[in-house]
A protein has these predicted regions:
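Short internal loop-to-helix segment that lines adenine-nucleotide cofactor pockets
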Residues: 45-68, 113, 117, 129-131, ...
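Short glycine-dipeptide loop
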Residues: 87-88, 202-206
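Conserved SAM-binding loop
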Residues: 93-96, 185, 209
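Cap/insert and terminal regions of metallo-dependent hydrolase folds
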Residues: 206-212
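Core alpha/beta nucleotide-donor-binding catalytic domains of modification enzymes
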Residues: 98-101, 105-137
Length: 257
């Protein structure tokens, strides 16, 4: 019965466009921001990734900072960070999922955040295009570039997305070098960082990374450890008992000599 009621409510909210009804985010890094009612109402009701949100708030005064949000989904963290950097800062949000990107841009416009720059692409170690796995649900938070050896379900229509290299965007002046980077890209963080190695070396931003695979863990450490970063676990996001995969970590650079 509960599933039936959920489907009926879902259909009603979408057909009447009440899913776009404006609400306010109640708590967390984006507290007070304008938001849309449905879906993913936990974003505005509160209780979503509380540990990670506390770390974002704990960054303190980030006025004027540049922040990158890799895997922004609907933009909860992008909006929250942009409200804190203010117009002298810049927040760059990467979201290749077209459904999620549309909602991200809606939330940007609802809050008048002209210094939040949404980019409808994934980031990787080389520019190009790639197949994006959705498993028939573009509203999921787990749509992703393929994991190593993963093959697409033949029943799901393929979606192709752009791939961009972060160092190229910085070199061209399209985006600023970051003070902070949040990464939740479903197993692709090591490739995203490989495409930003020059910027990481020069700018030495603070990073928060959500790990989803052992390959991703090893790849990220292979990039950040030689740069003098140290990692601290801040949250478990999948009930994982593994030491690192399935957890969120904050990476801080060692002080410059």
């Amino acid at each position: 019965m509960s599933r039936l009621l959920h489907r009926l409510a879902d259909t009603f909210l979408r057909r009447t466009h009440l899913c776009y009804w404006p609400v306010r985010v109640r708590s967390g890094v984006a507290a007070g921001a304008r938001w849309t009612l449905y879906p993913w109402s936990a974003y505005w009701r509160g209780g979503f990734e509380d540990e990670l949100q506390r770390e974002l708030v704990a960054l303190g005064d980030i006025t004027g900072w540049c922040c990158w949000d890799l895997g922004a989904h609907y933009g909860l963290y992008s909006v929250g960070l942009a409200r804190r950097t203010g117009p002298t800062g810049q927040v760059v949000s990467f979201e290749p999922n077209p459904v999620s990107f549309d909602r991200l841009d809606r939330h940007r416009r609802m809050n008048g955040l002209t210094w939040l720059k949404p980019i409808d692409a994934a980031v990787s170690d080389a520019p190009g295009t790639a197949e994006f796995y959705t498993y028939g649900n573009l509203e999921s938070t787990t749509t992703h570039l393929p994991y190593e050896g993963e093959t697409r379900n033949a029943d799901c229509a393929p979606v192709r997305v752009r791939l961009l290299r972060l160092d190229d965007l910085v070199a061209s002046g399209e985006i600023r070098a970051p003070h902070f980077v949040k990464i939740d890209v479903e197993g692709h963080a090591h490739k995203a960082l490989a495409g930003a190695l020059g910027t990481l070396t020069a700018a030495r931003p603070i990073l928060i990374v959500a790990f989803h695979s052992e390959l991703e863990v090893r790849g990220v450490h292979a990039i950040l450890d030689p740069l003098g970063y140290s990692a601290t676990r801040i949250a478990t996001h999948s009930g994982s008992r593994d030491e690192m995969s399935g957890h969120d970590f904050i990476f801080r650079p060692a002080p410059r000599a």
